[in-house]
């Protein structure tokens, strides 16, 4: 009985440790920090402010058509799980 319980515990630990290396979700500050760590050559991006972008005015729906279909790092790694290899592809 003790041996089988030991085997079950070891198998659970192995499964948990291998799951930690798989895909996971990166959102918000964790996503930004992870990308900064993985991609040190990337420049720091300034936070967008409303005043900075207000001068561009209203855009017609035709000019924004392609934007909806694009997938970005947030779509890939926050809304869904991703691996470090996927994150590295954004460097």
From Swiss-Prot:
Membrane-crossing segments per the record: none
Propeptide residue span(s): 49-69
Superkingdom of source: Eukaryota
GO terms assigned for molecular function: growth factor activity; hormone activity
Localization: Secreted
Database matches in InterPro entries: Bombyxin, Bombyxin_B, Insulin-like, Insulin-like_sf, Insulin_CS, Insulin_family
Keyword field: Cleavage on pair of basic residues, Disulfide bond, Hormone, Secreted, Signal
Presence of the UniProt keyword Secreted in the record: yes
Signal peptide start-end: 1-19
GO-annotated cellular components: extracellular space
Pfam families hit by this protein: Insulin
Disulfide bridge positions per record: 27-78, 39-91, 77-82
UniProt key word Transit peptide: no
Oligomer status and interactors: Heterodimer of a B chain and an A chain linked by two disulfide bonds.
Function: Brain peptide responsible for activation of prothoracic glands to produce ecdysone in insects.
Family: Belongs to the insulin family.
Name the UniProt record assigns to this protein: Bombyxin B-1 homolog
């Amino acid at each position: 009985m003790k041996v089988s319980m030991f085997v079950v515990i070891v198998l659970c630990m192995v499964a948990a440790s291998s799951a930690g290396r798989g895909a996971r979700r990166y959102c918000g500050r964790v996503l930004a920090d992870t990308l900064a760590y993985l991609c040190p050559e990337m420049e720091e991006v300034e936070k967008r402010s409303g005043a900075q972008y207000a001068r561009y005015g209203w855009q017609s729906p035709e000019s924004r058509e392609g934007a909806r279909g694009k997938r970005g790092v947030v779509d890939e790694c926050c809304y869904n799980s991703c691996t470090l290899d996927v994150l590295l592809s954004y460097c």
